[in-house]
């Protein structure tokens, strides 16, 4: 993927610098034309086979056309999943959201300059994970991240999340525990006056979990409004994600 030039005032992505980091990503906008080109290239390279629950393709298209903010969730199996998801976006009605989708991504992806440019171009927002920095250390940064994610939804952006938080090294057909962060983001977005919809994407790379082969991808019927407490939202997301994974595995 060809890199593009970002503004020179990008803050260093470190936990100690999280306030400046989230001030930057609160308003950061990638060039949409370049993002579309990159997603098209990823679609040509990764070639996911995209299938849908009956009626889901039209339902997703119609929902996006209403301008409803969308939360896109996918299961996490390998370090190639973000590229598979980007390729899926290009090959589905999600294409219209390219260039205005924020993607929550672990902070390690923002360290190397070239990789950071690519992640920024794809709409990345850094996440400082407790498994890397400790629960107490990331608490304040986590709250800022959720505030920024909710604000972007309230402005009409979509938000893409791998809510399991880490690669599934166990049974790829079984969704891991879903973190409560997605529930808190949705609750914060509701406080800002928007009720996001949910689009769920299941990914399967076959029995060997080999990302070198085209993935089976399955998109379920969208949930028009994510509502309830953070815990209730998180539970609904987990249920929808397992249904999507079941569909992807069955169609591999």
Locate each region found by the language model:
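Hydrophobic/aromatic beta-strand patches that form the interior of the parallel beta-sheet core
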Residues: 104, 125, 197-201
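Non-catalytic C-terminal accessory region of glycerolipid acyltransferases
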Residues: 2-13, 17-21, 25-26, 136-252
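A general structural motif
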Residues: 67-69, 98-100, 156, 193-195
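Short glycine-enriched loops at secondary-structure junctions
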Residues: 78, 107-110, 203-207
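Short internal beta-strands
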Residues: 101-107
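Membrane-anchoring hydrophobic helices of lipid-metabolizing enzymes
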Residues: 1-91, 98, 111, 120-123, ...
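Short, basic, glycine/proline-bearing loop/turn elements
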Residues: 128-136
